[in-house]
Regions:
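Phosphate- and divalent-cation-binding pockets in alpha/beta enzyme and binding domains
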Residues: 5-9, 67-69, 111, 156, ...
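Active-site diphosphate/adenylate-binding microenvironment
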Residues: 10, 14, 132-215
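Glycine-rich, anion-gripping cofactor-binding loops and their flanking helix/strand elements
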Residues: 1-82, 185-216, 228-232
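Thiamine diphosphate
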Residues: 7, 52, 92-94, 100-102, ...
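Phosphate/pyrophosphate-binding active-site segments
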Residues: 77-171
Length: 253
């Protein structure tokens, strides 16, 4: 996402404002997904979008607010929008911004923080934390049978995988659930084909990530159908002597 390098600054902004954070798929990990105010990948869930519809102000940092981020075409936004983007053409793209701030996400948020003081009361903070807990409770209660199966595997995977692991995911059911039900500690640890939702990218992306960062664990999450698109690239991985755990979700694809 456009705020991937602004994690420290955005985290400070969240603490200053005491606001709920709903990340897009590409924004997963910009703030640690375990932060009590974060709903990771929440834009794909109706429960989080319902909360967005009730907000009087939306601060959108480095996001295109694209259709592929929410699955419904348009966010149900009724409040004002303050939008931060490095591309001035995006400030009013799809949604009219009440305030547009053109600039790099990291530097712009840093300037916002300089103007803010942490004036959030403990009572306000608890109220916001409880709102996040309730949204997550609703999400969990509304999981489909398939999503519950995914959750079991993802929970185990999160426990055993090192925190620094990069997960290269394909367009498959397992990773769709992982978008909102798999916590990532920092940006660029969850690679997903958000733009065109293309099949077959997980393995090639993982090979590239492992070659760029040979000491960092990299794992592949892919469906059986998507894996067939780029299975020959296993030869490339072998030629480079890469260690790449591949988790294939078999669902008749």
């Amino acid at each position: 996402g456009g705020s991937s390098d602004a994690g420290k600054e955005v985290s400070k902004l969240v603490d200053n404002l005491g606001a709920v954070v709903i990340t897009t798929t590409a924004g997963k990990g910009v703030i640690n997904d375990n932060h009590p105010l974060v709903i990771s990948g929440g834009t794909v869930r109706a429960e989080a979008r319902e909360y967005i519809s009730k907000a009087d102000l939306i601060l959108a940092v480095g996001t295109e607010m694209a259709e592929t981020d929410n699955y419904v075409g348009k966010y149900p936004i009724n409040g004002k929008i303050v939008r931060v983007d490095i591309d001035e053409k995006k400030i009013n793209d799809n949604y009219q911004a009440s305030v547009g701030l053109v600039g790099d996400a990291k530097e712009t948020v840093k300037k916002l923080n300089a103007k803010l003081n942490n004036s959030v009361s403990l009572e306000q903070l608890e109220s916001v934390k409880n709102a996040v807990i309730e949204i997550k409770r609703k999400i969990d209660a509304n999981l489909t049978k398939s999503e519950k199966r995914h959750k079991k595997l993802l929970t185990i995977l999160r426990k055993i995988a090192p925190s620094e692991t990069i997960f290269s995911t394909d367009a498959c059911q397992l990773s769709y659930t992982g978008v909102f039900d798999f916590n990532i500690p920092e940006a660029r640890k969850w690679l997903h084909p958000v733009g065109f939702c293309a099949l077959g990218n997980a393995l090639p992306n993982a090979i590239g990530a492992k070659m760029a960062l040979p000491t960092t664990p990299v794992a592949v999450l892919v469906g059986d159908g998507g894996f067939m698109f780029s299975m020959p690239e296993l030869l490339s991985a072998k030629e480079q002597n890469l260690s790449l755990p591949i988790i294939i979700w078999e669902n008749g694809g």
